[in-house]
């Protein structure tokens, strides 16, 4: 079972499996295009170092398949990216040779156009290539590919350790997921970067990066159903195509069937369906799902708006029944303040859509999110009872977050409940070290739980 709170695990336990070394097998011309047009190395460094992550992967180039196989035998690589146009071997044969020696090595086939991969033997490709991506000049694709493989490797373990959340993208068309995946990661990481400035401590900053929602890309009905059945309460929502494989055959209504399956157990799970057929809008409405036309000129903007409004990214925006904003919250304190004054109808609307649990989970507040997630409005005699429960959980989390912590002073930390505040940078002095240690001992001992009506503070 997942642990109860973010304080019960070490942030270093998360994201154990990393991609550090990447082998790019590409012709000199393709390598040049990627570096000049896509700024491959520059973009990877920018994305990782810009997020204060010190493990930016290194990219090693091999000009042909023979050189690539030799380099694989000389050192270890975490990910292999092979381009379509390599001189001495087709990419499928290269993938087969790599898989024969290193069966668990992830291999990505990168093409410049979708038409390039239609002539490839599909059955052989499925066994030798883990994923196909289409390069369209978007430099954000490379960090998204890297992070997506890391997420898939780490999700099961991080779920058990820390109750991590996930967003499921169901799409079998490489052209579309090569565009959508970078958008989701950009939204998630920009959100994490924004939260960093509002965090109380260095530990919180690192936790927020490692505890961000995982983005899981699947391409079949069966894969999507398995993730839903196994991790139902930890899924923030689904972004799904309508037409993709089911029972090893393309099904024109697979996305509709997936949404119907989810709705049988979960009436509030955020789902957005995408299709080139605008008539599926009616099908989506019938099962309480949102819809985006894939050929819409505002596809990416509509998708980003859905992600921010339904998956907990950005400030919490309270709205009335007409959709008008009536209040907003950027952290737990302002969320509590707003909860005390919003109308019952607004509370009911957001509670019924899982907005509270998703917003809290994205911020690493897994304990509250896990408590609130399964609750339904009908479980309470009055909406005030629901309001009180959420506020009580927020109070408990605020107290737990502050216990035994040395908090950096800022305009957002002026709170009488804080035990210990650091006014400037540098090491603590002797007296301060002793006081900080005493606070830490009291916090770890949980002595206040042993004796009722007693408050111990330094």
Show which residues each predicted segment covers.
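N-terminal beta-alpha lobe that positions the nucleotide/phosphoryl donor
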Residues: 336-337, 342-458
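Hydrophobic/aromatic residues positioned on beta-strands within the core alpha/beta folds
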Residues: 109-112, 273-274, 294
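As written
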Residues: 91, 121-132, 283-291
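Conserved phosphotransfer microenvironments
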Residues: 3-4, 29-42, 54-56, 61-107, ...
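Conserved structured core elements
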Residues: 252, 256, 278, 297, ...
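Nuclease catalytic cores that cleave nucleic-acid phosphodiester bonds
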Residues: 259, 276-287
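Non-catalytic signal-transmission and effector/linker regions of two-component phosphorelay proteins
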Residues: 1-60, 96, 124-131, 135-214, ...
